[in-house]
Amino acid sequence: MILVSLLPLLFMTGIASESTISSGLASLKAKIDIKKPTGKQLFDKVKSMEQALENKFSDDDERAKVMGAIGSLGTAIGKFQSGDPASIASGCLDILVGISSVLKDFAKFSPVFSILSLVVGLFSGTKAEESVSSVVTKAIQEQSDQELQEALYGVKREFAVSKAFLDGVRNEESDLRPTEVSALAANIPVYQGVRFIAMVVQRIKYIKPKTESEIKRMLTMLELFTDLCSIRDLILLDLHQLIATPGHSPNIASGIKEVTSLGREEYQRVFEDLLKTDDEETFLFLSYLYPKEKNEQSRKIFKFFDLIEVKYDDRFKLDLSGGQALSTLQWPNYYLCPHNDYLANNCHDLRVGLKLEKLSDGFYTIKTYGRDPRTCYWTDDYVKISSTSNGELEKFSFVPVQVKGQKAYLLSTKKWPHNFAYSQKTANGLLSILKDVPSKLGYGNQGFFTISTYSNPKNRHA
């Protein structure tokens, strides 16, 4: 507690000597009970951290801020040694509060981030390892994303000023004089925002989304990128149109045009990797991005993909509405049809067809044909069929993928994009639900569906 009470003074003076850090670590070591199973291990790790800190931080201000992170450890150490899950969770919160309070000041200085790695390393091998690691990692990630959002605001403000300047120039009826062309170049640098755009591209490139939270973060990054590039392209287009006027500066105009397309090939490669339909690691991500119409975020992202000519599977653009024959890659000679109150993959011929209807948000309803048409809906365990409405549970998504060169679809829903249907290996072949891509869970091709149009389904009855 003494250590924590000293922090305001340290921050006001901006000075923390090496002996202060050593003193803080000594206080931390004093709180460790080496008689407990984890105590000796923690004690050794604190000693290792002490040496690392002495080698790593030379700036007084940085040392002061490092003390903030150490202080948060000092308050939490007893809770982690208790072995009680509730206390461990409370300790995680203590560390999160301690780190987030100082991150506001020093997150931009990469040398100081190493203390956070040391904090995580301190607890490795203990019961609290996963909890602490995830809390600290989340704190770093959220702070980093927040910084990016703040930086975006600054770049957008720069773009807004540039756009206002160009609008003012365009509103003048007289031609631009050579000196005014120079003024344009000075006020609207063609490289504006390039570095920031490159930062976002690198984030997108290396996020490698596998979990729901990572995928949502990726989608936010993509939306961020489309906002930024759209504004920048608009400004460069305005600038090009003004300078390309006959009698002005054709060479400069040509240069601006080249700058407009600069980097698009690199961006295309990054996004085309994200949209691969033959890579199982991307399938879950596609289920969150697709269909294109699902929400404003997806619409904006796909609109931008089309603008910069990103190549992706043509089936993203298809409308599957109408009478369709649905089968699986595992059993291509059997088709999906009603089995009592369930949808099953057990019809050898198409006695009862299925009708897909595309909705305004890009999702589909699946309905039966026959004298008593019913609608399919998603439950926790199966795809069921009912004559009554089941709201959002009726909205299905067909995610286009490729499996060893064969085109197929994953069957998911709007409500649970991370859940997928597969055909059971039983006599009735009921469609069951899994919380991941079925092939990744050992179900082979049972969860990959093929779709083909068949003629005159309305004349087919049970």
From Swiss-Prot:
Signal peptide (from-to): 1-17
Cellular localization per UniProt: Secreted; Nematocyst; Target cell membrane
Record PTM: Contains disulfide bonds.
Keyword flag Lipoprotein: no
Transmembrane keyword on record: yes
Gene Ontology CC, one term: nematocyst
Alphabetized UniProt keyword annotations: Cardiotoxin, Disulfide bond, Ion transport, Membrane, Nematocyst, Secreted, Signal, Target cell membrane, Target membrane, Toxin, Transmembrane, Transport
GO biological process: monoatomic ion transport
Residue ranges of the TM segments: none
Alphabetized GO MF terms: toxin activity
Tissue: Nematocytes.
Family per record: Belongs to the jellyfish toxin family. Type I subfamily.
Function: May cause profound effects on the cardiovascular system of anesthetized rats (at 25 ug/kg), since the fraction containing this toxin and CfTX-1 produces an initial increase in mean arterial pressure, followed by cardiovascular collapse in all animals within 1 minute of injection. To note, the same fraction does not induce significant change in heart rate. Has weak hemolytic activity. Is lethal to crayfish. Causes cutaneous inflammation in humans. May act as a pore-forming toxin, disrupting normal transmembrane ion concentration gradients in susceptible cells.
Subunit structure as annotated in this protein's UniProt entry: Oligomer.
Miscellaneous comment as given in the Swiss-Prot or TrEMBL entry: Negative results: the fraction containing this toxin and CfTX-1 does not cross-react with CfTX-A and CfTX-B antibodies. Surprisingly, only found after chemical disruption of nematocysts, and not also after pressure disruption of nematocysts.
Protein name in the entry: Toxin CfTX-2
UniProt source species: Chironex fleckeri (Australian box jellyfish)
